[in-house]
């Protein structure tokens, strides 16, 4: 299963298929926006071995400058199912989502476009790598995610905000 409807919080068992799906998407993105991109990495819970995750592939796209987003071929991105979420206002980040169902707003992939090796880039990569290197911490994170998914099954915003405290604590320890 890949994809979650807008606002829903659903966790599924980790799938080895997520890496293959990321690799396929990375190749597609390189043909569409590759000229402006320094690196493309999978991150988020689908990139952490052995833990449950929302079945959405988070993709980190590193660019020299966020102004490079203006050079993206938005028409080709839309043809591939990606839409720029211009209403998502996060300082230092531009967000695109791939939808397989526009009626239910079913997201399968989220592109987080950030400055390559800037703060966002380094934090996302460091957190992923730390959890993959520390299975006990990744299981603690999984437990938190399960509790929050039960608490907020239809409130993705609250789910994400409460997870942030754990992420920030880990990043501060590193």
From Swiss-Prot:
Superkingdom to which the source organism belongs: Bacteria
Entry keyword set: Plasmid
Cross-referenced InterPro entries: GrpB/CoaE, NT_sf
Record SUPFAM superfamilies: Nucleotidyltransferase
Any matching Pfam family: GrpB
Family recorded in the similarity comment: Belongs to the UPF0157 (GrpB) family.
Name of this protein: Glutamate-rich protein GrpB
Originating species: Alkalihalophilus pseudofirmus (strain ATCC BAA-2126 / JCM 17055 / OF4)
């Amino acid at each position: 299963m890949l994809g979650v409807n807008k606002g829903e919080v659903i966790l599924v068992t980790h799938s080895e298929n997520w890496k293959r799906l990321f690799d396929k998407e990375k190749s597609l993105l390189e043909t569409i926006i590759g000229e402006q991109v320094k690196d493309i990495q999978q991150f988020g819970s689908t990139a952490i071995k052995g833990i449950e995750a929302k079945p959405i592939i988070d993709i980190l796209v590193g660019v020299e400058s966020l102004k490079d987003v203006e050079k993206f071929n938005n028409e080709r991105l839309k043809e591939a199912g990606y839409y720029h979420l211009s209403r998502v206002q996060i300082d230092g980040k531009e967000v695109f989502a791939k939808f397989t169902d526009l009626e239910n707003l079913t997201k399968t992939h989220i592109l987080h476009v950030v400055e390559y090796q800037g703060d966002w880039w380094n934090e996302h990569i460091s957190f992923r790598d730390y959890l993959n290197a520390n299975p006990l911490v990744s299981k603690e994170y999984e437990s938190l995610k399960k509790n929050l998914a039960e608490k907020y099954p239809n409130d993705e915003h609250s789910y994400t905000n409460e997870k942030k405290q754990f992420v920030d604590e880990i990043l501060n320890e590193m």
